[in-house]
């Protein structure tokens, strides 16, 4: 139909001519067909004009992909290839893995998956089973194989599902959420603008550690990553936020930046709550909810990683996650200690603890062990300061992290300990959760923590990433109300229970009600030990 005919038809319709419904439908279909044909001709012409310009660029990209495939042994794609950078398709190599091998993997690693949509993804037992952006594939291929939490969670995360990961610290959780998050950002044809990936962490030290790991990936793909936390000036953080696509933050400082308008989260596509149980313990629940409200649920994929799975964490997850897949590594519903850690509990007079500490340091740092890293836990910062001075007086090169130190001093202390400049680190519980300090051979609990949960998290600083370790605990009569709970943990990990500890009784304080007080249960040592469930 010509343009003049269309104009005439339109003019007649305006003048009041009655056009039947069936004719109008035919007309619309014909117009769409004509337009589609015209657009197709235009595209063919544009494509011919562009072919010569793009030929050299295409050849170059093809060469890069072929080189990467030769290096990693898997198919990869350049930036902007949505096949490799977004979504998940099981590889033929993974599909050919015998089911017996998959069953063995699940059994040996105590893996449990709650899959509400029954997707049934198989774990990625090798990096060659992945199809990621080439730079990311190359970076992670430096490691021997995916950790259990990575192997099981990656398929669901790459498929865009909300995921809850329940696993001990030191299990590779940062790359478990970092690799799919950054890979998904690379599916965009141009560099994304604004904050797209947000990781919330309970402490400054843990936030810095997560940042150090993620920047290994973001630097390789041309994205900007920044870390915001309290205790330092905001000016540099404001500037970094303007350019960052990936942000790691503590709740308090992030809320400050949101309220002043420096942090805008409406574009967040990937939200991660790391150490969620720890954040709730520290009273960040309302802060977390306020931060989440700044994001848009219809575009947000949400991840939660936690070492334990108490009622409070379950309730938080139910409020903002959509049909999440829950991946548990080990028996994380109940409190249990790493079985690779040798636990030694010594009942002692409280006034003899610091003298005994010096004896233990000679024991654990003698001969071939003189350079071994030892992490010492005190309960309060005043105690930590006093013990630090005493150790330095006795000639020990000790670093310390506790509340009386500035953020710069704490960061410096951690750096010295990681580098081996100082082989003793004295800490309060600020360092008990989440921090990945490699090669800690021994943990000494100079003063027992306020809860057995904190005890388990403290000793978890050793025996990480498949290694073994020793945890030596000085226990006094002042902590006798925790004796029963400690006995349960020792029995659950197959560790010896000293007779002196049994003298304090074997009741376990389960819960306390404002009106009815505490409820207790007795430990029957003739039966197989049951682990404690905190609800």
From Swiss-Prot:
- Region annotation (Disordered) ranges: 1-82
Q: Where mainly located?
A: nucleus
Subcellular localization, as worded in the UniProt entry: Nucleus, Nucleolus
What taxonomic ancestry is recorded? Answer: Eukaryota, Fungi, Dikarya, Ascomycota, Saccharomycotina
Q: Report motif location: Q motif.
A: 125-151
Whether Nucleotide-binding counts among this entry's keywords is yes
Function noted in UniProt: ATP-dependent RNA helicase required for 60S ribosomal subunit synthesis. Involved in efficient pre-rRNA processing, predominantly at site A3, which is necessary for the normal formation of 25S and 5.8S rRNAs.
Could you tell me what this protein is called?
A: ATP-dependent RNA helicase DBP3
GN (gene name) = DBP3
Record remark on domains? The Q motif is unique to and characteristic of the DEAD box family of RNA helicases and controls ATP binding and hydrolysis.
Binding residues for ATP:
167-174
* Family annotation (InterPro entries): DEAD/DEAH_box_helicase_dom, Helicase_ATP-bd, Helicase_C-like, P-loop_NTPase, RNA-helicase_DEAD-box_CS, RNA_helicase_DEAD_Q_motif
Q: Which residues form the Helicase ATP-binding domain?
A: 154-327
List GO BP terms, alphabetically: endonucleolytic cleavage in ITS1 upstream of 5.8S rRNA from tricistronic rRNA transcript (SSU-rRNA, 5.8S rRNA, LSU-rRNA); rRNA processing
Q: Where is this motif: DEAD box?
A: 274-277
């Amino acid at each position: 139909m010509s343009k003049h005919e269309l104009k005439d038809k339109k003019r007649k319709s305006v003048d009041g001519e009655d056009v039947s419904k069936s004719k109008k439908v035919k007309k619309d279909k014909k117009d769409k067909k004509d337009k589609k044909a015209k657009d197709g001709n235009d595209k063919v012409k544009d494509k011919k004009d562009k072919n010569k310009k793009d030929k050299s660029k295409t050849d170059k990209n093809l060469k890069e992909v072929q080189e990467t495939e030769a290096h990693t042994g898997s198919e990869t794609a350049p930036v902007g290839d949505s096949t490799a950078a977004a979504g998940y398709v099981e590889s033929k190599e993974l599909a050919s893995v015998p089911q017996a091998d998959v069953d063995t993997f699940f059994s040996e690693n105590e893996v449990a998956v709650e899959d509400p949509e029954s997707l049934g993804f198989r774990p990625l037992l090798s990096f060659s089973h992945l199809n990621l952006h080439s730079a990311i594939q190359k970076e992670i291929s430096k490691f021997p194989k995916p950790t259990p939490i990575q192997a099981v969670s990656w398929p669901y995360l790459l498929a865009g599902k909300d995921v809850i990961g329940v696993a001990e610290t030191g299990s590779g959780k940062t790359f478990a959420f970092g690799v799919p998050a950054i890979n998904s950002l690379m599916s965009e044809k141009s560099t994304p603008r604004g904050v797209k990936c947000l990781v919330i962490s309970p402490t400054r030290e843990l936030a810095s550690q997560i940042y150090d790991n993620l920047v290994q990936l973001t630097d390789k793909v041309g994205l900007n990553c920044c870390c915001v936390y309290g205790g330092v000036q905001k000016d540099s953080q404001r500037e970094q936020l303007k350019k960052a696509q990936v942000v790691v933050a503590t709740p308090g400082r992030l809320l400050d930046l949101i309220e002043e308008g420096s942090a805008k989260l409406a574009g967040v596509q990937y939200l991660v709550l790391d150490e969620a149980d720890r954040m709730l313990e520290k009273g960040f629940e309302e802060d977390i909810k306020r931060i989440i409200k700044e994001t848009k649920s219809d575009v947000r994929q949400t991840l939660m990683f936690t070492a334990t799975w108490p009622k409070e964490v379950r309730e938080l997850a139910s409020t903002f996650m959509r049909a999440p897949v829950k991946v548990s590594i080990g028996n994380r519903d109940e409190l249990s200690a790493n079985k690779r850690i040798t636990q030694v509990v010594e009942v002692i007079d409280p006034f003899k603890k610091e003298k005994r500490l010096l004896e233990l340091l000679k024991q654990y740092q003698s001969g071939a062990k003189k350079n071994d890293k030892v992490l010492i836990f005190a309960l309060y910062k005043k105690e930590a300061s006093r013990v630090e001075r005493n150790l330095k007086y006795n000639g020990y090169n000790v670093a310390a992290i506790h509340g009386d130190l500035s953020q710069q001093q704490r960061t410096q202390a951690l750096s010295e300990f990681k580098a081996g400049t100082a082989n003793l680190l004295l800490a309060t519980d600020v360092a008990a959760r989440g921090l990945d300090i490699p090669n800690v051979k021994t943990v000494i609990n100079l003063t027992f923590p306020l809860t057995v949960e904190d005890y388990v998290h403290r000793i978890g600083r050793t025996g990480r990433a498949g290694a073994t370790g020793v945890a030596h605990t000085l226990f006094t009569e002042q902590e006798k109300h925790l004796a029963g709970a400690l006995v349960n943990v020792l029995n659950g990990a197959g560790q010896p229970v000293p007779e002196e500890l049994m003298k304090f009784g074997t009741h376990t304080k389960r819960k306390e009600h404002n009106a009815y007080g505490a409820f207790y249960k007795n430990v029957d040592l003739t039966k197989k030990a049951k682990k404690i469930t905190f609800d």
